[in-house]
UniProtKB/Swiss-Prot annotation:
Official protein name in the record: Putative uncharacterized protein encoded by LINC00336
Gene behind the chain: LINC00336
Region (Disordered): 40-111
Comp. bias intervals (Low complexity): 60-74
Length: 198
């Protein structure tokens, strides 16, 4: 006895070799699966429903679907402390002191904006130490925050005795205003906030 036409079509379209009994069994399983399950039940229960009427931001942790372009993925990668753009993004690696290879000082061929930023930070700390001297050697002023107008950034340009600034600097983009915020190291009380244009 020959298999029905739809079973033969299924066998040839899926490329399943074998006896007619296996083909019929496979066809019955496919038909049962298509008949018993509604269209949306094949999705996992935790998959979010998407409103196709409005654009949505990509979130790889929640959204199943296509990955963003490679250029976007490259921008989302975490930079390592030895990466040249690490300091330029506003993150100061831990342990980057004056003699560290990760620090970039004003006298080591740094760009003009970095040199100006370094001098402004140094003058800012000297001004703080002269107008509001710390009560003890452990209580010193330090710059706790540096922020762009569009993206907040943090720098730890700390000074133990308010006489000179650590040589770790940021490289602000030209024409983008920055804001320096200083506070006492022990009390975290904000002393002053000064704008700086790179």
């Amino acid at each position: 006895m020959r298999a029905p036409a739809q079973v033969r079509t299924l066998r040839w379209s899926l490329g399943w070799p074998g006896s007619r009994g296996r083909d019929v069994f496979a066809a019955l399983r496919c038909a049962q699966a298509l008949r018993c399950q509604p269209l949306g039940s094949a999705l996992p229960p935790q998959a979010p429903t998407r409103d196709l009427g409005r654009p949505q931001a990509f979130d790889s942790s929640r959204t199943p679907g296509p990955r963003p372009p490679r250029s976007t993925l490259r921008m989302m990668e975490t930079k390592s402390p030895t990466s040249p753009s690490y300091g330029a993004r506003g993150k100061v690696p831990p342990g980057a002191g004056p003699g560290s290879p990760l620090s970039r000082g004003a006298g080591q061929g740094a760009p003009l904006s970095e040199t100006r930023f370094h001098h402004v930070a140094q003058a800012f700390l000297k001004l703080l130490s002269s107008s509001n001297p710390p009560t003890s050697a452990s209580e010193s002023a330090r710059i706790i925050g540096v922020s762009h107008c569009t993206q907040p950034q943090v720098a730890s340009l700390s000074d133990r005795h308010c006489s000179k600034v650590n040589h770790t600097v940021l490289s602000p983009r030209k024409g983008v205003p920055l804001q320096l915020t200083a506070a006492h190291s022990s009390s975290q009380e904000v002393l002053a906030t000064v704008p700086f244009h790179g």
